[in-house]
C-alpha cells in the first residue's frame, strides 16, 4: 500500500487494515504492525522549494513508498501498516530520485542538495513509532576570486574521496570530481559554487586552472582544501552541514574561509 496524502491516510489505512488484521480472539502474532512516523520537525527543517519529501519502507522483499507535501507534514503523524519484523525506513528530499540503495554522485557533478533521515525500525509488535529528522547532508561551497588579471580567466576543479552515501547515510569512499558553477556575484565579480558531500578525511583538493587550457593541462595551483577546512575547525560530522565561503585574494595573498558563524584568515604565496 502507498498513502500519499495524510488526509486520506487514516481512512485508507483503516480500510486496508480490516482485511489485513485479526480479531481479539485470534492469534495476533501474524497481524500487521502500525508504524507511526512523527513528521512535526520536518516543515522547519526543509525549505519550501524542497518538498515533497519521499519516504520508503522496506522489509525483505516487501516495500512501500510515497510522497509527503508540506501540508502533509504539518498534520503531524503519518501511519503505515506493515508486516511485523525489523525494517529500514528513510525519508529524503533534494536527491532528484537518486537515493535508493544509497546515493551515488554522478561523475563530474557535485552532491545533490540532499536532506536525509534513515532508521532501523523494530516492528515486531502491533505498534511502532519513529520521529523523522531530516538532516542537511551537503555543504554548499562558494568560491570568490579577487586580485587576478581580468585578462586571464580561470576555472576551478574540486577533487575528493567521497562519492555518495550508503543506505544508513554514511559517506561512501570513492573518487569525487566536479567543476564549480560560475554565477554573478557581488560588485560585478563572479562566484563559483559547488555542493560537497560529507567528508571522511581531509583529502579534498581545490585546483585553479586556466580556463582556456585543456582538461589534461596541469593546474596553475592546487590548495589542500580539506586540510584548510579541518584547520579552520569545520565539523563534517555535524548533524546539519554548514555552508562555506572561500575568498581567495591573490593581490593580498590571503585566503578567508567562513560560515555564517565564523571566519578564518590564512596567508599563502602564489604566482599565477
PLM segments and residue spans:
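Structural motif
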Residues: 38-51, 144-151
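Tryptophan-paired
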Residues: 51-103, 154-231, 270-272
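Structured interaction patches on ligand/partner-binding surfaces of diverse proteins
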Residues: 95-129, 213-252
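Conserved "repeat-terminator" motif of extracellular CCP/Sushi domains
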Residues: 130-138, 196
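Extracytoplasmic beta-rich ectodomain segments of secreted or membrane-anchored proteins
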Residues: 137-159
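Short, low-complexity, Pro/Ser/Thr/Gly-rich segments in the mature regions of secreted, periplasmic
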Residues: 257-272
